[in-house]
Amino acid sequence: MNKFEIINELSNIEELVEVKKVIDYALKTEKINNVIFNIIIVDNNYIQKLNREYRKIDSPTDVISFALEDNDDINYSPIRLLGDIYISLDKAKEQAKEYNHSLLRELSFLAVHGLLH
């Protein structure tokens, strides 16, 4: 059984209900089981601070993942604590407009991308 939460640090985003369904589908399709993780929706300022502190890049990014386990731990634990996936809503909106698709598609892409890292 998988357990994840989408934590929205910003305003109400109706697309997040559908993003959750996309993540459930990706987990099932990729046969990823017994994992726990969070997806945290933040703004450009917050994700830039994370990017600067942990990657030494002083600019916002669209998604950044923090793993709680090393790959070596995967085979030994019945439940895997994957960690946290931070997504910049500002970047997601910019990129959805740039690529001429919906915010739902962009948020879903970023969430799955962050999960599979």
Residue ranges and their predicted role:
Residues L107-L116:
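Active-site His/Glu-centered metal-binding helix of metallohydrolases
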